[in-house]
Amino acid sequence: MRTLFLTLVLTANLYAQNDDYFQQGVAYAIRATLDDQRHILHARLDLTYDNNSPDTLNRMAFHCWPRAYASDNSALASQLLRQRNTDFHFAPPAARGDLDSLSFTVNGQAAEYLEDENHQDIVWLALPEPLPPGESVVITTPFRVKIPESFSRLGHVGTSYQMTQWYPKPAVYDRKGWHPMPYLDQGEFYSEFGSFEVALTLPRNYRVAATGTLKTVSEDQWLRELAITDRRRLEARQDLEDYFVTEPFPESDPERKTITYSAENVHDFAWFADKRFKVLHDTLQLAGRSEAVDVWSFFTETEAAYWMNSTAYLKRATRFYSDRVGTYPYPQVTGVQSALSAGGGMEYPMITVIGLTGSEKDLDQVLTHEVGHNWFYGILGNNERDHPWMDEGINSYYEWLYLREYYPEAEGDFDFLRRPIDLNYFGYRHLALRGRDLPPDTRSDSLVDTHYWISAYSKPVLALREIAAFTGQNALEDAIRFYYENWKFRHPGPEDLFQTLEGILSPALGRAFREAMTSRATSDWKVQDWKPGEKSSASFLQLGQRLAPATAQLLAMKAEQPATLMVNPGEEYFADDLPLSLGVELPAALNPLDLYLHNNRRGDNSLRLNLLTAPERPGGRQIFFIPLLGYNEIDRFMLGGGLHNRTLEPKRVEWALAPMYSFASNALVGFGGIRWRIREPFPFARQLMLSAGSQGFHDFSFAGENYNYTRSAVRADLTLADHPITERHRQLSLQWINLARFRPGFDPGGNLMGSIREVNSFFRLAYVQRKEREINPVAWSVRLEYKTEDVTRNSLLEASYLRLDTELRGAYQYEPERFFRWRFYGGYFLVNALRERASYPNTALSLVDNANSDYAVDGIFLGRGGGGTYAQQLETRQGGFRAPISSSFSFGRSNDYLVAVNLDATLPFQPERFPFGVYLDAGTYGFRPTSSEPSRGEFRWVGGFSVTIMDGQIGAYLPLISDPDTRLLLEQTGGLAERISFRISLTNWLPWKWIDEVF
């Protein structure tokens, strides 16, 4: 009775709050003819538009989304480049699409239209007469669609057609006005509910799958007979493939057919046509409806072994959502396997299209997700562009429930070192721990790939799992079922869902979910205390920014089942008289939005030692071991092991210790460090990283003795807050380096007497900014460096200096994966006691960036002795010359200034797998041959061929042309092989950099 009362009150409140709600009406009649020789669709639209608003309309916004494929000026083209997809950018005009031949009439009167000022795929139709409330108009126009190749959702591959968002479509008009939106690859749509009558004319041997009910009896009968025949043939075959198959297209039948479809209560119409389709059919009887649902699947030879079971998956998914959300209301459900360039699957009313999947389970999962969109998108027609989480997030939660029910053995999305990885959980934590997450209620056109996945899909799933753990699964499903029944075939917004959860579950839970969806506030529950005993007790403290529920679990003795208790939101919560247990834990599975796990367990919290790494566990007492093998010129092979605490996810405090034994030096070498990650230390900053570390290896050999160095550094990196959509990254750094080198010592007579310690300290202040665009990325940096004087050594070469370094680099992608790259560098000593001297220490500016000029040991070089093959390893700092000139020469060194330019280009006529290129380096610098001579400007240049991979991280460079002085020095290095320089940028090979840069 209480539940019924609450439901009635909530229903009354919801309707009272939405008494100004209205919804426009649309009825489409479309006739279209496919020309599959020219990939053109000729069509006519007759649209009846009902103005149910209280406003008089003078104009209407229409989406002409195929126009997004017409040029590089569309929002689609820009977004594809942000997604690092250049296929459309480099596509020839013949491969692109368009929508033209519009000629609008309104109630028989000609009507003018204008293209939107900002978007070529939106037009504004001026109504000849105002459309008052409660009235209707009939709008007609011919239109022609030039079908693009498959770059996103609409397109064709050969004569396989994916016809989606293909017709002129009015934008939604609601309480907030018109909602025109450009077509996007990532970011879906918002459309009016209505009816469709669509007649398609095309060659007779096409098999068509579409939204709605097929009204052409002969075509329907043909497909049903075909489904019986195809199933028999497929069941008899032993050669069905489970991978991509290149399947030829049959010739089109010269005879044409016209087939008609109708659909009610839908807001879109999609169709797919392919002469190669195999067809399967089944029916599904559901509780709550008298007529069976027709279940269809259309697929090619590609992954046919998996698609043999597709109708069973479709039936199971449709029943699952019907039981848990609401009975499926449409007459049919269809799955199509076809070309798809926008994600793994895409939903439309009653029909979904799926690309390659890779396994039966993955096919089942993707089909289930897309079928689920019939409820969360098809029936609940929220604004997907403004609030993508409302359909993707909630639907992904039900997909997660489906997988738990039908694949209980699959604990995660994949296994890493035999440990299950939940990608929703892992992905959210990886972004949030580094301050890179965004609120789920962010417009989809403001999200880049990873953020779209985490914000629209992952975090809403975790927030709903958090609520279900607290209230129980049934209570949450009841609330969503109520929301569904209240808003089906309408346009709910976030507030409607929040109010439902607040009313059905509790105000606190509703507010917690609201905050999780609309903010970046984090939750952090801590097990403050736990006291063992026959009646143990525990206290919990809320440290996070977000008011959130938590669910704790007792660690039971032996075979006893763990007991679960609920922890309400608040500053602190005490629990007394708990059953006997080994401890208490806030499990990650029950508290998936709790960001910091190190404080989530008390009691049984033993230290664990694992190999390599693992996901973080509550309590955080984990140490990992990594076997290490190293090599350098002096130490030769080094064997050791690394201990660290870095889990797959970033941690607040991370440390590593990696001792190794050098067999050549008979000594311990290695490195170690610690860093502290502070999330959002200031309103303008995303992250502050404080780090300290030390390393020690041998880098010099003399008279049979190896001499070592020790480099210690402390650093602070402040990453500024830039929205990911800007593609801009800014970082401010402060660093102190102390470098101690041991070198042979000599008495006044020149006799070797032990070793001496050379110490240098450097202070650096730097700013770096990058614009990571796909076609023309650019980055610049400025660094101020102060070197302290080594007072223990009486040498002018150890004097202090103040130096300014600037760098500007960029690239232009002129063909797919073929770049022209450029770099400018300028260095100047603001203060330098050696400016008037002809002595050039390794701290001097240098055209060649080799081990000798790496004076602060910033890079990783295989050898630092300066000779042999090791001297051919170069980097691209300072002058960046790709010429292995010996550091024993004063070539390219300056105590005053240095300016250089580095150019290289990938050759346009080469195969992609062999990235040959050409390069040219040039520079000028201030040089004194002797201290008594005035400084003069020297100009040097060198050019040649290159082979590079991994975006230039690995490369080989052969100098072929140069100025005379440079040529002479190159000839002195030896033959052709000795003149080749190579680059192996080892600092970018650390595994954590790979993982962190993915997210």
Predicted regions located by residue number:
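Glycine/proline-rich low-complexity spacer/linker segments in large multi-domain proteins
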Residues: D72-N85, R144-F196, T216-E219, T283-Q285, ...
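C-terminal outer-membrane beta-barrel translocator/porin domains of Gram-negative envelope proteins
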Residues: L629, F671, Q687-Y707, V714-T719, ...
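N-terminal, polar/Ser/Thr-rich
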Residues: Y15-H42, V157, G510-E515, T613-R617, ...
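Hydrophobic alpha-helical and helix-loop surface patches within well-folded domains
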Residues: A16, G25-V26, T48, Y261, ...
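Beta-strand-rich binding/interaction modules
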Residues: A209-A210, F272, L509-G510, S523-P587
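A surface-exposed beta-strand-loop module
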Residues: D50, N85-T159, Y243-P254, T258-I259, ...
